[in-house]
Design a protein with these regions (language model features):
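H-loop/switch region of ABC-family ATPase nucleotide-binding domains
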Residues: 190-191
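Conserved ABC ATPase "signature" region
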Residues: 107-125
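Conserved ABC transporter NBD signature motif
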Residues: 57-70
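Catalytic Walker B motif of ABC-type/P-loop ATPase nucleotide-binding domains
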Residues: 154-157
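Conserved ABC ATPase signature
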Residues: 129-133, 137
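Helix N-cap at the start of a conserved alpha-helix in ABC-type nucleotide-binding domains
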Residues: 165-167
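H-loop (His-switch) and adjacent beta-strand-loop-beta switch element
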Residues: 202-215
Length: 242
């Protein structure tokens, strides 16, 4: 177990957004955290990261994982596109939690920055201004930055929003590499589930509560069952109206 939610209730100022949240994420898993807009996905992520306070329940981490050691790539923000720093500076800033009260980055953090530039295949961009890059390039830079913060868990909030098909495909390839070769646990928040099911090995479906937690094959069976049930209920209503 790397992350666990038990009987979790979350929301804002006692207004419940999600309740009865129970799931466990294991080391090395590739998780699709799925739900419609407004289903509470981003609220759950912010609560896991400690940016929001939980109302009830527990969030437990493995001994070698903490909220500060989780890499996080938030939803696309237009304000970031004009960020004046270089690509190298943006990626290196992911090491800020590692330096503590030291005034400078050490050799290990510089080495880690270089390594993440290499992993994301953006070494040729390191001296470019972040604001000059395309959307897909900026996404890679921010992903490298998030990886500088973690060896264990990376959370990405709607990373495919605004990307064209070709760019999204390349991002999937990068994420597969991060998960399989680096062994990083991925939690991908999205409402685009179809393509993500081809890559993830666990699905968590939210809608005011945790509707499902299991592998993609089980989830497809769950969807089929829910569809047949809804069709059956629809026909029953139709019969009553006849």
């Amino acid at each position: 177990m790397i992350l666990e939610c038990k009987n979790l209730v979350i929301g804002y100022e006692n207004r419940v957004v999600l309740k009865g949240i129970n799931f466990e994420i294991n080391d090395g898993e590739y998780v699709c955290l799925f739900g419609d807009n407004g289903s509470g996905k981003s609220t759950l992520v912010k609560t896991i990261l400690g940016l929001n306070s939980k109302l009830k329940g527990e969030i437990n981490f493995a001994k070698d994982v903490s909220q500060r050691s989780i890499g996080y790539l938030p939803q696309h923000n237009d304000n970031l596109t004009d960020f004046p720093a270089s690509v190298y500076e943006v990626v290196r800033s992911g090491c800020l939690n590692r330096i503590g009260f030291r005034p400078f980055y050490n050799k290990n953090e510089v080495k880690r920055t270089r390594n993440m530039l290499k992993v994301l295949e953006i070494e040729n961009l390191e001296n470019r201004s972040f604001s000059e890059l395309s959307g897909g390039q900026q996404q890679r830079v921010l992903l490298a930055r998030a990886l500088c913060a973690t060896d264990k868990v990376l959370i990405l909030d709607e990373p495919f929003t605004g990307l064209d098909g070709s760019t999204a495909k390349k991002l999937y390839e990068v994420l597969d590499k991060i998960n399989k070769k680096l062994g990083v646990t991925l939690i991908i928040v999205s409402h685009f589930v179809e393509d993500l099911l081809k890559h993830a090995n666990k699905v968590i479906h939210l809608s005011q509560e945790c509707l499902f937690c299991g592998n993609p094959d089980e989830y497809k069976k769950h969807l089929k069952k829910e569809y047949l049930l809804s069709r059956h209920q629809l026909f029953e209503v139709g019969d009553e109206n006849d």
